[in-house]
């Protein structure tokens, strides 16, 4: 890692040296020409020197805030942050771009990248909190609603299914945890919540109904360990017979799902 950092530093210094040398030889950029200034500012971006690109493009934005190239400079800054895995900064930059330029030709791309930035931060493991996955889903849903005809919207729809599946599996993981701890009120509640929020995943819904039925059967027999916790007593008003009826109801729902 240290070796790579040294190599990167050498490349940065070399790039700066070459830029300065070039500046001495070439004709200076006309300060009244935003197009020429932008072309010069984006050179580091084209050469994948993203840290320098952020600086140069930021200076261009400050100098020519009303230029037609200013929005493109904003996108390139966000792209640079994303390329450097600075996802929180990238998400903020892309979000700001959409807010300022909702009708720009790059707006759909920027909205897609807001979601992608959060997605890059989200853990793959379903036993970990999925806050970033939920944020990505929310941003892609905005994209599909605001820019339904865009190519990015089509990509987002595929990723939305993947994201929702991950969150559903995380919900299943939590429900399983409660069942293993014999906390059956919370177990049944979590499984039924999964069936309501993610009905499109038939395999998960079938398992959820099956496990909810088992949890209700345990509750009917008074075997839950969460009876002393008011926050977890979701079905305390139900009699033993009503709990058994619930168990039978959800066994039937599970059996009705054909995979």
Enumerate the language-model features and the residues they cover:
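Bacterial N-terminal signal peptides that target proteins for export
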Residues: 1-12
């Amino acid at each position: 890692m240290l070796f790579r950092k040294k190599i990167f530093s050498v490349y940065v210094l070399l790039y700066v040296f070459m830029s300065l040398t070039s500046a001495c030889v070439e004709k200076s950029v006309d300060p009244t020409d935003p197009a020429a200034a932008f072309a010069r500012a984006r050179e580091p971006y084209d050469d994948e020197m993203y840290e320098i690109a952020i600086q140069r493009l930021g200076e261009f934005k400050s100098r020519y805030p009303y230029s037609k190239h200013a929005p493109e400079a904003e996108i390139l800054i966000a792209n640079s942050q994303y390329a450097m895995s600075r996802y929180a900064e990238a998400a903020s930059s892309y979000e700001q771009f959409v807010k300022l330029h909702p009708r720009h030709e790059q707006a759909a791309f920027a909205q897609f990248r807001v979601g992608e930035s959060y997605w890059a931060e989200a853990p793959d493991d379903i036993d970990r909190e999925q806050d970033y996955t939920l944020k990505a889903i929310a941003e892609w849903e905005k994209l599909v609603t605001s820019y339904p005809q865009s190519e990015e919207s089509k990509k987002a729809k595929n990723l939305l299914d993947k994201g929702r599946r991950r969150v559903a599996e995380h919900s299943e993981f939590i429900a399983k945890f409660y069942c293993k701890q014999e906390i059956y009120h919370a177990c049944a509640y979590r499984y039924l919540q999964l069936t309501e929020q993610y009905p499109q995943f038939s395999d998960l819904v079938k398992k959820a109904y099956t496990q909810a039925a088992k949890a209700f059967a345990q509750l009917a027999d008074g075997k839950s360990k969460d009876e002393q916790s008011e926050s977890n007593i979701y079905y305390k008003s139900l009699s033993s017979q009503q709990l058994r009826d619930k168990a039978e109801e959800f066994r039937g729902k599970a059996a009705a799902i054909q995979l």
